[in-house]
Design a protein with these regions (language model features):
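Helix-coil boundary and interhelical linker segments in multi-pass alpha-helical membrane proteins
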Residues: 23-41, 92-106, 143-155, 194-200
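Short, Lys/Arg-rich, polar N-terminal cytosolic tail immediately upstream
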Residues: 1-5
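Transmembrane alpha-helical segments of multi-pass membrane transport proteins and ion-pumping complexes
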Residues: 14, 18-19, 49-58, 89, ...
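Juxtamembrane helix-capping/reentrant segments at transmembrane boundaries
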Residues: 8, 67-83
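The first (N-terminal) embedded transmembrane alpha-helix
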Residues: 9-29
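Membrane-embedded catalytic cores of phosphoryl/pyrophosphoryl-handling enzymes
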Residues: 105, 109-200
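Alpha-helical transmembrane segments
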Residues: 37-52
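C-terminal halves and exits of single transmembrane alpha-helices
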Residues: 81-100, 122-124, 128
């Protein structure tokens, strides 16, 4: 069972969810953007949210700044999370200002905001589950899209919630997090898009 839960944690890793979210967005939301524009944007998202974070973790492990790719301790998480806050904010700015795809910009502003809340928690020696944070963001994002486009994305929302439950169970079984860290991660992720949408 431990091996299964490890596989689940890898497949639904936080750096994978943003790319999946953007792919779902392009599938579900009608737009007049050319396929080449969508592909360019998807490539930018993949590089910024997957390849760069992966490279950062590899470099940090080589430099012995982290012991494992999970960056388990609060101290190990500080610098990677700080870099992710900046990366996601710059990505949101780039997408909003160059393509006008404000919905996707919202997704990454929200991610930056949720990571900022996570970073603030470090000062209180609180760690949050980034796996659950990413799924909380995805859940809330598609709820907001439902309001914006007067459509129901209930299937996506329900699947997100079910996956969050599976991942939460996996992280708890692997003793990667405590229940409070799992709940806090999903909570920060869920409220971030709502907050960004309300204020922007």
């Amino acid at each position: 069972m431990k091996k299964v839960y490890k596989i689940i944690s890898v497949i639904l890793h936080p750096i994978v969810i943003p790319t999946i979210g953007v792919i779902l967005y392009f599938i579900l939301i009608p737009s007049n953007y050319a396929s080449s524009t969508k592909l360019t944007l998807l490539s930018l998202v993949f590089v910024t949210t997957y390849l760069i974070p992966l490279l950062i973790l590899v470099v940090f492990k080589r430099l012995k700044l982290i012991q494992t790719f999970n960056a388990d301790s609060i101290q190990e998480r500080k610098l990677p999370v700080a870099m992710m806050i900046v990366l996601f904010y710059l990505l949101a700015n780039t997408i909003t200002n160059t393509t006008g795809m404000n919905d996707i910009g919202l997704l990454f502003y929200a991610t930056s905001a949720a990571l900022t809340a996570t970073y603030v928690c470090f000062a209180f020696q609180l760690k949050t589950s980034l796996h659950l944070l990413s799924l909380g963001i995805s859940t809330s994002f598609f709820i907001i899209l439902g309001f914006i486009y007067a459509s129901s994305f209930s299937t996506v929302v329900v699947v997100n919630i079910l996956l969050a439950g599976v991942v939460a169970n996996a992280r708890l079984y692997l003793k990667a997090h405590t229940p409070s860290e799992v709940y806090l991660g999903f909570f920060f992720g869920f409220i971030a898009p709502l907050g960004v949408y309300y204020f922007l």
